[in-house]
């Protein structure tokens, strides 16, 4: 018995088609008369076209609803990813403490405070390049530590301390420099020269000049002997140097314990003469000590600032007599006293001393630790 399938009403068919409940073979045409139904079934081309139209409408309806969900989940995932990224960003640091504040941390071993002269507006932008030759000896740790304590007080100015070891760098000197907390560079030179020879010092100075020249360091270059005693006023005056400056330096003789004063005689900042004690030093062109002058480091690598354009490079003379080496080096920087400035204006202040101290023997305990001669001489009762 043939079953008779009743079609849905037109309103119900539209409702089912809108919500995708009709299958691909459901018809959306309204009921018609048998004559019209037979005519539609007899035309297969129109039926196929009508079936394709129904599939397109159903697919368009089924793909329309997931788009808002996809957009919502995409935005949610992006937001969660940004939260994970923001959680790994560096947190802002707290306010930088004011060094002049009364609530700063107090050092349990305070350093004696010295009155500082008023600094110039450009003092914070001038690099001080301090060159110190050193060699292995029992008093090396004492010299380097004392020099470092002086340089640590120059916290208001950029500083680079170049320490040049005669021979290979030693672990003892490197450890002593690391404890100073001063920005430094520790290098060795003249490995083939005996450290007790009198001609190793020019090689050390030239090694430091090579560093300044190769890296094009711009600042005030000063040769500070490790045996010297320095005032803070000296380093504050060094920041104001424009080209070349000099000042008098007293030196205590090791043999006679006499004070030898060498340096310029100035009038309103202009060098008008020289003061010297030894008669043999009168043969020199400039009567100054190696720790009694400073100059702009750009004179080493900028030919436009040199007084003698014929010099290819400015280096410390190595084949000149020791007493004439300082004057021969300065002759490469300036032509005469008119290109010098005396500091202070009248050159009447002593701002550093050259005081030799300690044994000159190159033998010293390894690690500065004594392992022998530690027997008990006076026992406890």
From Swiss-Prot:
Intervals, Cytoplasmic compartment: 1-69
Mode of membrane association: Single-pass type II membrane protein
Recorded GO MF terms: galactosylgalactosylxylosylprotein 3-beta-glucuronosyltransferase activity; xylosyltransferase activity
Alphabetical list of InterPro entries matching this protein: Glyco_trans_43, Nucleotide-diphossugar_trans
Bias (Low complexity): 26-46
Enzyme class: transferase
Domain of life, source organism: Eukaryota
EC number: 2.4.-.-
GO cellular component: Golgi membrane
Alphabetical GO biological process terms: cell wall organization; glucuronoxylan biosynthetic process; plant-type secondary cell wall biogenesis
Carbohydrate attachment residues: 194, 296
Lumenal side: 91-381
Record keywords: Cell wall biogenesis/degradation, Glycoprotein, Glycosyltransferase, Golgi apparatus, Membrane, Signal-anchor, Transferase, Transmembrane, Transmembrane helix
Region (Disordered) residue spans: 21-50, 96-122
Subcellular location: Golgi apparatus membrane
Annotated TM spans: 70-90
Job description of the protein: Involved in the synthesis of glucuronoxylan hemicellulose in secondary cell walls.
Protein family per UniProt: Belongs to the glycosyltransferase 43 family.
Protein name as annotated: Probable glucuronosyltransferase Os04g0103100
Organism of derivation: Oryza sativa subsp. japonica (Rice)
Gene encoding the protein: GT43H
């Amino acid at each position: 018995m043939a079953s008779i399938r009743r079609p849905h009403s037109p309103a119900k068919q539209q409702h089912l088609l809108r919500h995708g409940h009709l299958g691909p073979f459901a018809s959306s045409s309204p009921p018609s008369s048998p004559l019209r139904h037979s005519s539609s079934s007899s035309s297969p081309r129109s039926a196929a076209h009508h079936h394709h139209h129904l599939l397109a409408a159903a697919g368009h309806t089924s793909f329309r609803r997931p788009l808002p969900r996809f957009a919502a989940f995409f935005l949610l995932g992006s937001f969660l990813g940004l939260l994970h990224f923001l959680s790994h960003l560096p947190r802002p640091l707290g306010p930088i403490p004011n060094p002049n504040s009364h609530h700063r941390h107090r050092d349990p071993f305070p350093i004696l405070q010295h009155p500082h002269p008023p600094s110039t507006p450009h003092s914070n932008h001038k690099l001080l390049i301090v060159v110190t030759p050193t060699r292995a000896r029992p008093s090396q740790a004492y010299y380097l530590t004392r020099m470092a304590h002086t340089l640590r007080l120059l916290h208001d100015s950029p500083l680079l301390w170049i320490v040049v070891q005669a021979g290979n760098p030693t672990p003892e000197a490197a450890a002593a420099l690391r404890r100073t907390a001063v920005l430094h560079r520790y290098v060795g030179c003249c490995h083939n020269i005996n450290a007790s020879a009198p001609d190793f010092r020019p090689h050390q100075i030239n090694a430091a000049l090579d560093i300044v020249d190769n890296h094009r360091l711009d600042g005030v270059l000063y040769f500070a002997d490790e045996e010297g005693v320095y005032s803070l006023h000296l380093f504050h005056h060094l920041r104001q140097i424009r080209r070349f400056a000099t000042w008098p330096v007293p030196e205590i003789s090791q043999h006679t314990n006499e004070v030898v004063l060498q340096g310029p005689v100035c009038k309103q900042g202009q060098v008008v003469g020289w003061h010297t004690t030894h008669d043999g030093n009168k043969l020199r062109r400039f009567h100054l000590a190696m720790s009694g002058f400073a100059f702009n480091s750009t004179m080493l690598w900028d030919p436009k600032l040199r007084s003698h354009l014929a010099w290819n490079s400015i280096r410390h003379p190595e084949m000149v007599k020791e007493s004439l080496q300082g004057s021969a080096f300065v002759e490469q920087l300036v032509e005469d006293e008119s290109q010098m400035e005396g500091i202070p204006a009248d050159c009447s202040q002593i701002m550093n001393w050259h005081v030799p101290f300690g044994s000159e023997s190159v033998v010293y305990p390894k690690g500065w630790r004594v392992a022998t001669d530690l027997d008990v001489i006076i026992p406890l009762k």
